[in-house]
Amino acid sequence: MTQITTMGVIIHPEPDILECKVKRALGTITTNKASGGDGIPVELFQILNDAVKVLHSVCLQIWKTQQWPQDWERSVFIPIPNKRNDKKCSNYRTIVLISHTSNIMLKILQARLQQYMNPELADVQAGLRKGRGTRDQIANIRWIIEKAREFQKNICFCFTDYAKAFDYVDHNKLWKILKEMGIPDHLACLLRNLYAGEEATVRTGHGTTDWFQIGKGARQGYILSPCLFNLYAEYIMRNAGLEEAQAGIKIAGRNINNLRYIDDTTLMAESEEELKSLLMKVKEESEKVGLKLTFRKRRSWCLVP
């Protein structure tokens, strides 16, 4: 049985990382990208003969101790103005620079997480699912519309997403969700320790700020963030009871009331009243875990035969 010490270190961890997994992860890192806070370009690892061996040793040490190097916990935020009016923070988008070496470890951790996450995610979630994407969901919506017309059914849609979804992820709730979803303690401990030591600095043309801690949100710029948010969103939809709800579009013996791509959700029903009922359930459960549906971007429309 898995045990955890009072310091949060796993006594009996998951199977060790293999060197071939490190080599594979390194090969997927994109070149010609800006370096993180450590200043090490990814191209350096491609010319060093023993790079894979050294990286494997470091990753294995992290795997065994669940403790991350400080440079791997740090991010550099670079704000880029989207509009001419650069007086408002909302008019900026942020580029996040992280260590390329940390990305290697994160890719390995992501692969392990996916093994446990995929069975937990509903079929209607297409985000970060192998062989699936936004095109599939668009095709599904078109198919549903065609079938609704064929069977002379009304159909109402509501397209929703969350206001700054990743920024408002509550860490304590996230760890609770990981446990409820059956994520092994070893992997959850690695994530908790990574987030506990998270630091960032903001770099502008005027200089760089001091390092500061971040206590909320899924880590910006990290490949794991969409995966973790998938579980966060799945928890919301389960508690909203969408799978058991009577509201939806009943086609081919199945009731369909939502399609998802990470934080983007399309709700659907045969009447405006049913659609509103679904929306209120999702809204209530979202607010319980700190997320708010964005009404600025929400769109809805109905089709009648």
Regions found by a protein language model. Name each.
Residues M1, N32-G37, T65-D71, D86-K88, ...:
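Short helix-interrupting loop/turn segments at helix-coil junctions
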Residues M1-S90, V96, H100-I104, L121:
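Surface-exposed loop/turn segments and immediately adjacent short secondary-structure elements
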Residues H12, H206, L293-P305:
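Short, conserved micro-motifs composed of acidic
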Residues L18, G37, P41-L44, L48-A51, ...:
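Hydrophobic (often cysteine-bearing) scaffold residues that line and stabilize catalytic clefts
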Residues N32-I40, F77, K87-L97, R135-K179:
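Conserved catalytic palm subdomain of right-hand nucleotidyl-transferase polymerases, strongest
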Residues S90-L121, F166, G215-E244:
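Conserved pre-motif C helix in the palm subdomain of viral-like polymerases
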Residues A165-M181, G217, L259-V289, L303-P305:
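Catalytic palm subdomain of template-directed nucleic-acid polymerases
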